[in-house]
Amino acid sequence: MNVPGDLRYTKDHEWVKLLADGATALVGITDFAQSELGDIVFVELKPEGTVLGEQEIFGTVEAVKTVADLFAPVAGTILELNGVLDAAETVNQDPYGEGWMVKMKVADPSSLDALMDAAAYTEMIGG
């Protein structure tokens, strides 16, 4: 299972990557999540400008087997949606790269410290 060391993780299998500006982050679902969901056929995200609290639902992922909610790993505002996700299978193919979901302005960048690092997430998923 692919668990990049430069990301932070949630118990709900979202990842977050703080970008170089220190205030903006990319958010997506983990490789573990996409493999458990199976073939992803549709991604629905809240619109740009939506203000989210930590753990607030920011969208859903529809797979052949199920529909799953997406939870914001940190509080912030959605700045951009990943237009590539019109081809939802991108999430299965590249969950940490082209398959990111939203770009957020993070309300408090230090809140990422409360999320799991790669080692803790790997342990949680039994890796």
UniProtKB/Swiss-Prot annotation:
Cofactor note text: Binds 1 lipoyl cofactor covalently.
CDD domains, sorted: GCS_H
InterPro entries reported for this sequence: 2-oxoA_DH_lipoyl-BS, Biotin_lipoyl, GCV_H, GCV_H/Fam206, GCV_H_sub, Single_hybrid_motif
Residue ranges of domain Lipoyl-binding in the record: 24-105
Cofactor: (R)-lipoate
Keywords assigned by UniProt, alphabetized: Lipoyl
Residues with the N6-lipoyllysine modification: 65
Pfam families per record: GCV_H
CC terms in the record's Gene Ontology section: cytosol; glycine cleavage complex
UniProt superkingdom: Bacteria
One example of a Gene Ontology biological process annotation: glycine decarboxylation via glycine cleavage system
Keyword Transmembrane appears in the UniProt entry: no
Purpose of the protein: The glycine cleavage system catalyzes the degradation of glycine. The H protein shuttles the methylamine group of glycine from the P protein to the T protein.
Entry similarity comment: Belongs to the GcvH family.
Alphabetized PANTHER family for the sequence: GLYCINE CLEAVAGE SYSTEM H PROTEIN, GLYCINE CLEAVAGE SYSTEM H PROTEIN-RELATED
Subunit structure: The glycine cleavage system is composed of four proteins: P, T, L and H.
Name of the protein in its database record: Glycine cleavage system H protein
Biological source species: Chlorobium phaeovibrioides (strain DSM 265 / 1930)
